[in-house]
From Swiss-Prot:
GO molecular function (one): monosaccharide binding
Protein name listed in UniProt: Glucose-6-phosphate isomerase
Enzyme superclass (EC): isomerase
Highest taxon of the lineage: Eukaryota
One GO cellular component term: cytosol
Chain's gene name: Pgi
GO BP of this protein: canonical glycolysis; fructose 6-phosphate metabolic process; gluconeogenesis; glucose 6-phosphate metabolic process; glucose homeostasis; glycolytic process
Consequence when changing V329I: In strain: AF-F, F1-F, F1-1S, JA-F, LW8, MW18 and ZW20
Cited Gene3D superfamilies: 1.10.1390.10, Glucose-6-phosphate isomerase like protein, domain 1
Catalytic residue list: E362, H393, K523
Subcellular location(s) of the protein: Cytoplasm
Outcome recorded upon mutating V471A: In strain: JA-S
Amino acid sequence: MAGPLPPLNQEAAFQKLQEYYDSKGKDLNIKDLFVKDSKRFSKYSLRLHTQNDGEILLDYSKNRINDEVWDLLLTLAKVRRVNAARDAMFSGQHINITENRAVLHTALRNRGTDPVLVDDKDVMPDVRAELAHMKEFTNMVISGVWRGCTGKQITDVVNIGIGGSDLGPLMVTEALKPYGKGLHSHFVSNIDGTHLAEVLKKVNYETTLFIVASKTFTTQETITNATSAKTWLLEHSKEPESVAKHFVALSTNKEKVTEFGIDSTNMFGFWDWVGGRYSLWSAIGLSICLSIGFENFEQLLDGAHFMDNHFKTTPFEKNAPVILALLGVWYSNFFKAETHALLPYDQYLHRFAAYFQQGDMESNGKFVSKSGKPVKYSTGPIVWGEPGTNGQHAFYQLIHQGTRLIPCDFIAPAQTHNPIAGGKHHKILLSNFLAQTEALMAGKTVDEARTELSKAGLCGNELDNLLPHKVFVGNRPTNSIVVKKVSPFTLGALIALYEHKIFVQGIIWDINSFDQWGVELGKQLAKAIEPELDHCNEVSTHDSSTNGLINFIKANWK
């Protein structure tokens, strides 16, 4: 790749966008744009054709963009060298510059035969060997060959991890519940003992398998939870040998794993070129395999590989991750939008927004460029959301009539896994999905509100007083993503779509999307504070607020 990028706000293409925004862009009205162009939907939407899972539709026509804006945004992507950065990632270059690592979660789902090189070594043989190990173990557990210490078949799987070792597997197992193979999945992440205690109340030691997910096998929260789970098991089994029947490890630290009591043959590894928030495709996905079966896990990989190929080979103007990324830059850096809402209209996707809170905010929540200089423009947005229609009765009020601009992605399947009441529920759900994006775009004018109130029998002061409250400004931007059905393949494609969107935005902002130093400071300070909670003496070594909090907690400890 060429030399360092200039600061984004000094890029000529960015400055042209700023000029256009100031003169015309800020006044673009989505409703008017549809009136002026009868072909707007076909111009600003695309369909991705899968082999067996139908089409994936991305409709981005309900955005504050026109041809001029779009051409300028595409130019920005080109001058920020998104193509070169994408190729560098897929080719195994060390694009994680602060940790000197390659970024190759895409290799984990590489379904082709081409080699993938990291430091001149093809990693695919190791990837395939680990997948084969996962397949063998998964089939043993699901078939009942693997049994607990008393000879009973495994019925429950408890994944103990945190961050990327928890959020991804949890989200996917919830999303793909219709494909479950009969095992009950549980997840423990929080160091709060309540999390583990409540899970242990639900399971039987004779039929429970614990997965300890920690690359180093030293992660404080994970190892503390795993050790307490081990103590619980031994209190019931009374046999140290039972640990090897009820615990497996997702780790690369053989010494620590065997010291814990886990047979090293039941240790599943991954590599330093796999970031935590991109690790569900690796051995970290073992809990997914046990939930949905290895064949369905392969379909998840296939879907992600499909999106990888789309991202690698498709021109920017038809490239779904690039399109979503550029729209986000448009709103973050010009309209000063601070948040982005992910709104899946499918209950199985109820953890999707939480998963991409980490995926986006941990990746692009950075204030310095790759060269270490503070940036003078906005970077990663605050990402949040809930499933529809729950969100409609909670926070949509602010999206519709609040003072903040909140771009939204609406996600829905055309088909449901649960067509109860003859499909009535799903029809109501989809009617709301469709109505919300139309309402956010069109709003309700003063005249429309007045007519509506008049028809309801209001007049005079009563009508005039209520009228302002019934007006919707509209012009709220949305994307709509529709899949045929939430399947392992389409879910894999959706996850990869957002992964690559985040990557493209990081390139445009010239930040490193693959480290997370912001996680470290609080952990360092917690280690210093923890010993201060061991004694009853008042503490005075911190600021007055922290001292006061520590001393209050200690006074109320018992």
